[in-house]
């Protein structure tokens, strides 16, 4: 008795097209309608793994890690230089959920850059900022501004060590006027020194010392006087 074989079912044409359109693994350039394109690895139709994304309108280029369609891991972002037109690196570091997160270096200009911690694409944690005028800030950051304990070293060598809040000197701190050989220690509010003591400090090595040294003034209880003045100031601030 002859045995009949069932004909093998062929794949529907639309299923074949859909299967071939699915992006998985390494792919060459995949273009978007607006001209943006991506070269790299895919998983389940989204960018995942190593890859390079180019944004046509801005000229921005990201090279690095991707997870489920977002920049995640280590990567470098480059933008066109407004003067030369050539791409220059503006950020190298870690990303999470398409935002700068973890340790990274951000270049704001040829002589101005930040190296340190990031959270949600904002400077947050510990970091060091090199300003174009030669000043350097090193310390804690929050919401893209110095906040917490930190030191600002000015180009001329003078420096402030102490508390910061919202990008300004706020709280207890010391300012070393090394150019004049003096040290101020006291309390600041929004970059203004409100109360404290000034003494000579390194006056013999100062390039421009004051004409006369600060005379020694003896108070029976200098710490108590300063504490009382500080308490009065804080009370006034609370009343306002």
From Swiss-Prot:
Record Pfam families: MORN
Q: Where is this region: Interaction with TP53?
A: 206-240
Q: Does the keyword Repeat apply?
A: yes
Any single GO CC term annotated in Swiss-Prot or TrEMBL for this entry: acrosomal vesicle
The Gene Ontology biological process terms listed for this entry are: negative regulation of signal transduction by p53 class mediator
GO terms (molecular function) for this protein are: protein-macromolecule adaptor activity
User: What's this chain's function?
Assistant: Assembles a suppression complex (suppresome) by tethering SIRT1 and MDM2 to regulate composite modifications of p53/TP53. Confers both deacetylation-mediated functional inactivation, by SIRT1, and ubiquitination-dependent degradation, by MDM2, of p53/TP53, promoting a proliferative and cell survival behaviors. May play a role in the regulation of spermatogenesis.
* Protein's name according to its UniProt entry: MORN repeat-containing protein 3
Q: Give the source species.
A: Homo sapiens
Gene name of the encoded protein? MORN3
